Amino acid sequence: MRAWDAEGKPRKPRVVCIGAQKAGTSWLHHQLNEHPKIWTTPFKEVHYFNARHCPEHQQLLPWHFREAVRATERRFRARGEEMPDEMVRYLVEMTADPMFTPKWYRQAFAPAPRGTLPLDTTPEYSTLPDAGVDEVADFLPRAKFIYLIRDPVARAISQL
């Protein structure tokens, strides 16, 4: 299990990774997850800002998020491991209503140990409207951003 601070205080991510579909965000997320100074949530995509600013996402995101939690549970079972109690509590809290509030978003990164950089990898942030981009800038003024892009033709072919 990754480093985990069960007593951690709610905090904001220090790094945000966004990008187009098939641009490599999953690969980069998994690579950064291996770095001892980067902390990632047990699920890749947090979806906070698009839940708040993309009405077309709002209906599906609670289900999608709960499914990501079930996938995390399946990964533990597949490895023959029991999920630690503190992670179970965390996942229950993350899937309880109300979701996608500022408090909820900060709580998503609370288990990140001191000295690590919490990472939010949500490619869909690249589709935010102007109001969403403004909220990101206001809410995360010190965050560093990674925007992955890919040749559009190669990306389209990879989706076939």
Predicted feature residues:
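PAPS-dependent sulfotransferase catalytic core
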Residues: 1-116, 121-122, 139, 143-145, ...
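Adenylate-forming
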Residues: 123-127
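ATP-dependent NMP and nucleoside kinases share a basic, alpha-helical "lid"
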Residues: 128-146
